[in-house]
């Protein structure tokens, strides 16, 4: 649910000239084209012409920054001048407000900006003053000496088009024009003598107006914006936003609840039930479903319509005031000043009620049909459809497993949000709420947060605490959060509370309707108001401008309420030396190189409504003197109002912190003569700080005489506090809402900040922060449990790719995604780099150009040229018969359909071209609603990725063949040249992954698909994907491997992959150059068509050089083959011809009835060994469904002599080891194997038992086991008796996440042949925990991932994962203490007996990914510090404190853990 504030602050300018836009510590004042690229509706690298009605792209910009234009407007400059916060938000979310949205044209229109202080302006003087030549960015020549070009954004009538106004070559400054008494940015300006005159006097060229409408998504590629997408009609490019990225393919579902106009200080209103965003878009044209764009009755007033319709209301152009007038003696009431009010906590409360099953809004929050929302703006007001309630009962019918999330978009200062159950200030009752909500007590929740933050009593700047209220940001004792309101320093009298955090905490600890807790993500828009931090020595002093109205319009200076002035504009005159001598703003000629700032603040004299314009201007001059003191001087410059205003600041970080009201406002039309006679009046007031008096001095009875007024100029000198400020500011409520709004606890990102709090300080980062929020939300669901890391030894180019999947619409739609994450220097997952779905071609022409190949039968070197084809309909005909119907039947038959079946499923008019184009990604035959057209509607371009694990081809890859002495010298030498050429090239790196859309996909390192291959083994049922009643099938679901190999006289990069559960097939592709992949690069495909021993190959294949000089692919035959045997395949890598098959027969009849789930056998995962160091394979270990661990001997050059290594006295093959449970029943082995050198000789093989692919496997409670088996080269191991046991025990104290103890019994290899760990907690019954992943060896430790299926009560796919870290030699605990960076700063869990940690997640983890930071790169803490883990010592990993490793959890990358490791070369040897 998108929860969105909609108050007036959204309509201020995006670039206010008083923000640090690029994070360099320096305020970015004015336009910085060489430093910053400004975000907005215009293409920053394009030149625009103004044609009188709109801006149009005309040419590519030039110059070294790519932004300069001659005689035209630079798009980047227009973004800087014209973008409002609302414009930026609209563009981020859905591409912008489309005023025109036709098939051939899109025109975006800027947000309405009334002619008051919401309007803004910029100015230009000269190259020497501003740093750029205006003629490079606008069709203007330089102004004359002492003159300025002024720019303003405003709207000149209530229904008018927003305008960019240009007042050229004038002597006036920008504040003389846009900060004048109403109307602003009009025809009048004020002079330095405070006189109102015509702006066109004094040599001005006059005012020119430019309507703020822009035509976007040009047909010219070089002019088109990067967010324009080509839709299927092949003519419409449309601007898109992040809702398109995450919602158009239904990866996420969105609803919208916002504040309302009618109830502006109460509650919130649902405008869109949670639904698919794609319903708001015409899938063929990309038009929004508004104004008849989706046919009769097809309009959808959803998220786009609502946010596009939002605007400022109630501004009257007759007198330039708001309808509520001047409210000066009390806070605003309901229905007054519609644009003010942001009750965020109450909106969040409504959202919890919605998730919890409520069927209607709270009456206190609801609006009626005569409201401004409905009657004026025509906003939608739908009936509530609770997401987890079934459709037949009026709900949306979503799965209880779907993760409910609130994403809150709001200014950091909520207001008036105290009308909630349990509120300190109201008797609001939740008795009628859903059952899950009835225990909500916001005061109790808020106080729990206070205690979690340390509790006690502290001094904070706040408007009210524990009934102590002065409506000012004065220091007050705070002892809880439940009685705090009046957010400071900006809005101490507007009733903003911390109840939003309380509501979030309640949702994170209570399940609302579904089976999961509600998670809160906050996109916090920084206040548009200024806050200045001054470096003073080694400390920082914070200063925020502040003013109060004290007399006029009935205000009583001694009453309970005096309006806090709104800061409605500010102008930085000069700022320097704020970032030290190396900073970009350093200037030794200004204040001796010490910090200096000079700025003007414009104050409005009431808190809301009125005329919302400048009523007083104060000039602030602040600098650090030679004594390292902060000097603050204020001067009253201008006034135009009938209310007396006292102006000052709130300061902290000094020895005299507090609220200072220092100066008066001037009498209207008077200039400042330095005496009190120029003031509007002299008013006694409790917050006054007369010269030489401190805060609180005037708050006395009787009031001292010198408190009777203030001067128009004041200077004060501050010293820095040696122990920090006495009083400080609380963080904003949204920060606490994020911190306590996640059911997994406090979640930190890799930089140590909250992973679900996204502050937006300026528009440049708005899209980035929203993308991070949505990415974090999307990563919660559907992980396939696998991961691939590019650059596990962390460098600047390291990244990880994680596949995921989702299922919707009763299992008729299964979509996949692969997300690439940056890996930060500390090894943790960082920002999202790209999404693979965005890189799959879309649009008819692009889909037609997709590079997709298939094979009409099995493939080898004898038939490759004839059977490998492009995957298009005409190529699926073996040879044309000349008869259309016959050829069509042949194509349909290859895809699994008879002509009758086509008619039954799709109708009689469907052609082979249409079906094949659909499978290539064409959506034109899908309906606008689910399954109303011939083909099934898909909500993403990729199929689900469940068992497939991505493999990565990197430029840095080096497989070591240059040092393989068993290879001929010419091959070794040429390999060195081959890898050097690759490493020095600029070629892209590539990621290969199979998906259940029937394809093996190849993506480059930017996420763009380069080619895809449809194996013949899945071709015969590929057409089923189009069936509207589709039930899930596996297709390309197997594992792949990648290596360099010497084929036909040259080195090539080869991928060998399998279809896994999707079919009985293995294939090999030459991927040396993925960008030029063609038919000849399909080397071979072997399937059950040409070999009855081929089964469903679930194991990973290997690419190896053999001792007979051949290169081969080696793999187990998989499961459920026709013959039902366990067979090792050795296939010529270049030709696909079979070199040798070796059956591993254990004497169990496949048709027999062995008690341990025997049935048919099959060989799964392997481990290959080079025992003599020559680079050639000598041995292979493999495991099967009968629990056998086999050893195959491949030594020697004669393939006929290769076979099973161990045999009985009769010459029958026997396994090295048979895995059995304590009762003697065999344990199937389907996970991977890992091998290390043994204690004195031989090898240790690591694996686990368990199965998770057959029917009823989910329900099995059979005991599985982790093993470390020593193959000493002598007699076969005689079962468990020959092994040492380690025991799992429950942790003796609770931790988060959960941990387990594993014993550390000593092991002597003189008497034992390894160890085992039964996957059952001592004293408990087996829960079905099993090992189906591949172990990972690192530094003397072995990492096992295990899975416990079906533990979720409500979600059939539920389960949990555990990570075991065991000593490789003994199997004892070796996890020790670990750092959990995502759960709190420096938190650690575990001790020397800890052997396992819960890693959560619903999907079984199939691979353990690890990154390693380089020595002396950042780690999360320093060993020995409080809460920082020590390095666990293991068999051969001595204590060291410089390096760390991170274990990445593919189910939830934000929950990955870090632990320290020994640096440098390890004595423990492992084989790769």
UniProtKB/Swiss-Prot annotation:
Residue spans of biased composition, Polar residues class: 1383-1397
Domain of life (superkingdom): Bacteria
Positions bound to Ca(2+): 1170, 1172, 1174, 1176, 1178
GO BP term (any one): type IV pilus-dependent motility
Consequence of gene disruption: Shows twitching motility. Loss of increased twitching motility at higher Ca(2+) concentrations. Forms T4P. Impaired in the calcium-mediated increase in single-cell attachment to surfaces, but biofilm formation is not affected.
Segments traversing the membrane: none
GO molecular function terms listed in the Swiss-Prot or TrEMBL record: metal ion binding
Record's function text: One of the three PilY1 homologs of X.fastidiosa, which are involved in bacterial twitching motility as component of the filamentous type IV pili (T4P). The twitching motility of this protein is enhanced by calcium, which may provide the bacterium an adaptive advantage in environments with high calcium concentrations.
Compartments where located: Fimbrium
Stretches the record annotates as Disordered: 1383-1403
Any Pfam family matching the protein: T4P_PilY1
Lineage: Bacteria, Pseudomonadati, Pseudomonadota, Gammaproteobacteria, Lysobacterales
Protein's name according to its UniProt entry: Type IV pilus biogenesis factor PilY1 homolog PD_1611
Species assigned in the record: Xylella fastidiosa (strain Temecula1 / ATCC 700964)
First-listed, main subcellular location of the protein, grouped into a coarse class: other
Sequence similarity: Belongs to the PilY1 family.
Gene (name only): pilY1_1
Induction per the UniProt record: Expression is not affected by calcium.
Keywords, alphabetical: Calcium, Fimbrium, Fimbrium biogenesis, Metal-binding
Cellular component GO terms held in the UniProt record: type IV pilus
């Amino acid at each position: 649910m998108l929860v969105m504030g909609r108050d007036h602050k959204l309509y201020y300018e995006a670039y206010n000239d008083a923000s640090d836009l690029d994070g360099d510590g320096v305020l970015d004042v004015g336009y910085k084209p060489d430093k910053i690229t400004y975000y907005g509706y215009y293409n920053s690298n394009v030149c625009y012409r103004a044609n009188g009605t709109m801006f149009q792209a005309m040419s590519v910009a030039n110059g070294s920054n790519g932004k300069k234009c001659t005689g035209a407007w630079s798009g980047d400059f227009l973004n800087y001048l014209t973008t409002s916060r609302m414009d930026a938000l609209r563009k981020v979310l859905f591409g912008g407000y489309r005023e025109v949205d036709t098939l051939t044209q899109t025109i975006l229109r800027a947000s309405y900006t009334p002619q008051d202080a919401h309007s803004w302006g910029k100015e230009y003087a000269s190259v020497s003053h501003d740093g750029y030549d205006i003629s490079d960015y606008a069709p203007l020549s330089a102004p004359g000496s002492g003159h300025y070009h002024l720019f303003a954004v405003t709207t000149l009538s209530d229904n008018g088009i927003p305008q960019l106004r240009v007042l050229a070559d004038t002597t006036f400054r920008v504040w003389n024009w846009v900060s004048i008494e109403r109307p602003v940015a009009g025809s009048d300006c004020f002079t330095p003598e405070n006189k109102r005159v015509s702006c066109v006097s004094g040599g001005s060229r006059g005012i020119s107006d430019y309507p703020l409408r822009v035509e976007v998504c040009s047909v010219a590629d070089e002019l088109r914006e990067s967010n324009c997408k080509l839709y299927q009609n092949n003519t419409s490019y449309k601007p898109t936003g992040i809702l398109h990225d995450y919602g158009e393919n239904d990866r996420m579902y969105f609803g919208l609840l916002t504040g309302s106009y009618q109830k502006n200080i109460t509650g919130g209103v649902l405008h869109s039930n949670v639904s698919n965003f794609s319903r708001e878009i015409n899938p063929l044209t990309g038009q929004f479903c508004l104004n008849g764009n989706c046919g009769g009755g097809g309009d959808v007033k959803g998220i786009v319509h609502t946010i596009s319709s939002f605007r400022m209301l109630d501004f009257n152009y007759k007198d330039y005031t708001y309808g509520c007038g001047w409210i000066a003696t009390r806070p605003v009431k309901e229905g007054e000043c519609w644009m003010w009010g942001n009750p965020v906590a109450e909106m969040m409360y409504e959202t919890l009620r919605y998730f919890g099953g409520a069927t209607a809004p709270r009456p206190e929050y609801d609006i009626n049909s005569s409201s401004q929302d409905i009657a004026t703006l025509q906003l939608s007001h739908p009936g509530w459809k609770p997401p987890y309630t079934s459709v037949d009962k009026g709900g949306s019918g979503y799965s209880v497993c779907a993760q409910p999330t609130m994403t809150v978009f709001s200014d950091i200062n909520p207001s008036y949000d105290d009308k909630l159950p349990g509120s300190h200030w109201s008797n609001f009752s939740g008795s009628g709420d859903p059952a899950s909500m009835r225990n909500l007590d916001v005061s109790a929740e808020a106080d729990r947060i206070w205690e979690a933050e340390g509790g006690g009593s502290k001094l904070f700047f706040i408007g009210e605490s524990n009934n102590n209220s002065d409506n000012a940001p004065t220091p007050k004792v705070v002892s809880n959060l439940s009685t705090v309101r009046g957010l400071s320093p900006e809005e101490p009298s507007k009733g903003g509370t911390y109840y939003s955090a309380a509501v979030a905490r309640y949702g994170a600890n209570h399940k609302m309707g579904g089976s999961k807790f509600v998670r809160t993500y906050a996109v916090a828009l920084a206040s548009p108001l200024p806050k200045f931090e001054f470096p003073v020595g080694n400390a920082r002093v914070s200063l925020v401008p502040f003013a109060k109205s004290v007399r006029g319009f009935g205000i009583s200076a001694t009453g309970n309420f005096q309006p806090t002035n709104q800061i409605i504009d500010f102008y930085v005159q000069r700022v320097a030396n704020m970032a030290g001598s190396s900073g970009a703003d350093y200037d030794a000629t200004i204040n001796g190189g010490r910090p200096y700032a000079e700025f003007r603040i414009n104050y409005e004299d009431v808190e809301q409504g009125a005329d919302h314009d400048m009523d007083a201007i104060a000039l602030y001059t602040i600098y650090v003197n030679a004594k390292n003191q902060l000097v603050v001087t204020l001067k009253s410059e201008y006034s135009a109002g009938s209310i007396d205003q006292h102006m000052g600041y709130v300061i902290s970080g000094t020895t005299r912190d507090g609220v200072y009201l220092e100066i008066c406002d001037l009498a209207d039309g008077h200039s400042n003569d330095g005496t009190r006679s120029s003031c509007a009046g002299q008013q006694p007031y409790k917050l006054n700080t007369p010269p030489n008096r401190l805060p609180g001095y005037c708050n006395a009875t009787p009031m001292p005489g010198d408190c009777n007024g203030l001067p128009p100029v004041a200077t004060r000198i501050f010293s820095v506090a040696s122990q920090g400020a006495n009083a400080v500011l609380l963080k904003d409520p949204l920060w606490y809402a994020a911190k306590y709004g996640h059911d997994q606890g406090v979640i930190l990102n890799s930089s140590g900040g909250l992973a679900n709090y996204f502050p937006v300080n300026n528009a440049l980062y708005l899209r980035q922060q929203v993308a991070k929020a949505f990415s974090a939300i999307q990563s919660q669901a559907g992980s396939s449990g696998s991961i691939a890391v590019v650059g596990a030894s962390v460098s600047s180019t390291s990244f990880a790719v994680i596949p995921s999947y989702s299922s919707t619409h009763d299992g008729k739609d299964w979509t996949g995604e692969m997300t690439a994450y940056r890996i930060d220097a500390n090894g943790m997952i960082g920002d999202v780099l790209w999404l693979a779905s965005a890189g799959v071609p879309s649009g008819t022409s692009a889909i037609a150009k997709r590079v997709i190949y298939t094979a009409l039968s099995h493939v080898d070197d004898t038939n490759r040229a004839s059977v490998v084809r492009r995957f298009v309909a005409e190529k699926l005909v073996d040879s044309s018969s000349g008869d259309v119907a016959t050829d069509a039947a042949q194509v349909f038959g290859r895809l699994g359909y008879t002509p009758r079946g086509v008619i039954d499923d799709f109708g009689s008019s469907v052609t082979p071209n249409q079906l094949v184009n659909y499978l290539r990604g064409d959506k034109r035959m899908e309906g606008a609603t689910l399954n109303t057209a011939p083909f099934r509607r898909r909500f993403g371009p990729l199929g689900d990725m469940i068992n497939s694990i991505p493999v990565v081809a990197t430029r840095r890859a080096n497989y070591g063949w240059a040092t393989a002495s068993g290879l001929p010298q010419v091959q070794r030498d040429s390999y060195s040249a081959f890898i050097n050429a690759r490493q020095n090239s600029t070629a892209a790196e590539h990621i290969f992954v199979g998906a259940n859309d029937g394809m093996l996909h190849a993506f480059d390192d930017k996420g763009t698909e380069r080619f895809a291959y449809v194996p013949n083994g899945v071709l015969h049922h590929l057409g089923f994907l189009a069936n509207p009643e589709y039930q899930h099938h596996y297709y390309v679901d197997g594992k792949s491997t990648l290596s360099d190999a010497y084929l036909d006289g040259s080195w090539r990069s080869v991928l060998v992959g399998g279809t896994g559960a999707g079919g009985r097939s293995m294939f090999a592709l030459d991927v040396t150059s993925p960008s030029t992949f063609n038919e000849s690069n399909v080397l071979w495909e072997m399937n059950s068509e040409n070999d009855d021993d081929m089964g469903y190959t679930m194991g990973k294949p290997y690419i190896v050089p053999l001792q007979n000089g051949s290169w081969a692919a080696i793999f187990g035959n998989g499961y459920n083959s026709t013959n039902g045997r366990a067979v090792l395949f050795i296939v010529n890598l270049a030709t696909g011809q079979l070199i040798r098959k070796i059956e591993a027969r254990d004497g169990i009849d496949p048709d027999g009835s062995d008690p341990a789930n025997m049935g048919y056998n099959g060989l799964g995962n392997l481990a290959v060994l080079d025992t003599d160091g020559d680079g050639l394979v000598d041995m292979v270990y493999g495991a099967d469904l009968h629990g056998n661990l086999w050893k195959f001997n491949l030594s020697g050059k004669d393939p006929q002599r290769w076979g099973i290594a161990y045999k009985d006295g009769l010459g029958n093959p026997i396994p090295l080891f048979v895995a059995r449970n304590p009762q003697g029943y065999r344990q199937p082995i389907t996970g991977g194997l890992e091998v290390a050198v043994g204690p004195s000789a031989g090898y240790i093989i690591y694996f686990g038992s368990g199965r998770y692919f057959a029917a009823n496997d989910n329900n099995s409670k059979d005991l599985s086991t982790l093993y470390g088996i020593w193959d000493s080269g002598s007699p076969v191991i005689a079962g468990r008796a020959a092994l040492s046991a380690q025991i799992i025990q429950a942790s003796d104290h609770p931790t988060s996440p959960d941990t387990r103890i594993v014993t550390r019994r000593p092991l002597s290899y003189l008497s034992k042949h390894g160890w085992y760990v039964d996957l059952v907690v001592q004293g408990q019954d087996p829960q079905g925990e099993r090992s189906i992943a591949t172990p990972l060896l690192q530094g003397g430790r072995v990492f096992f991932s295990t899975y416990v299926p079906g533990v979720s009560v409500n979600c059939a796919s539920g389960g949990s994962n555990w990570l075991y870290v065991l000593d490789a030699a003994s199997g004892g605990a070796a996890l020790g203490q670990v750092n959990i960076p995502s759960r709190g700063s420096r938190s650690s869990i575990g001790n020397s007996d800890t052997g396992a940690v819960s890693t959560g997640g619903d999907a079984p983890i199939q691979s353990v990914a690890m990154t390693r930071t380089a020595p002396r790169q950042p780690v999360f803490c320093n060993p020995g510090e409080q809460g920082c883990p020590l390095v666990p010592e293991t068999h051969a990993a001595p204590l060291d404190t410089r390096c760390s490793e991170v274990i990445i959890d593919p189910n939830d990358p934000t929950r990955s853990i870090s632990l320290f490791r020994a640096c440098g070369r390890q004595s423990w040897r492992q084989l790769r």
